[in-house]
């Protein structure tokens, strides 16, 4: 899980609370019931707005990466100069990963060359940091556009392709994810390079995650079932996972109110 807070009311205090949850995603009592120790279960990263990176870095150990949403999130329609500057500032502030937002207009206008050049420039600005290209699948109109945008972003240097900002009317689902996974597989067959996949938006239950895990396993195989190549972007998913583990260990569900969210 990329444990995420990307709301208009985000504050330093809210990020600090999220980081505490990231450090202890499952309560100590529940870990004991499961026969696990603190550190056995860890989030993939903490994802925040670029201006809150320092706050996240201050409250997290080095083994938990901080991902910053940059490039005019969520619309991706700021000027190119401004969006590129956000990447530079995010890295200066300590971001380990950069989630970029593509300009969906390039896709809708079939301007694939411009999309390639922009993502390649963002990759160059990010230097050695991993970038996740957010396609905004709900805005791309057709699955053919989703497929083409996926391939262009991978060719331009994206380390991950991500379904959504979470702000669109249509976010990650099995249909658009299948298309993206098929493109990842095709790219791997052509180049030998593995690209990561990040579904995001509306994923709030463990049951839904299992469906995505099965899809990734069927399309790409076991090598992709790890944080290096698979992340789930979510803000409330961890609460449901903890409830399911509670049920597994104790035979009953805990009320959500009794599970710490930060």
Roles of regions detected by a PLM:
Residues 9-41, 50-197, 204-235, 243-262:
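Alpha/beta enzyme core
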Residues 1-6:
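Generic N-terminal amphipathic, Lys/Arg-enriched alpha-helix
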Residues 240:
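N-terminal beta-loop-helix "entrance" segment that forms/cooperates
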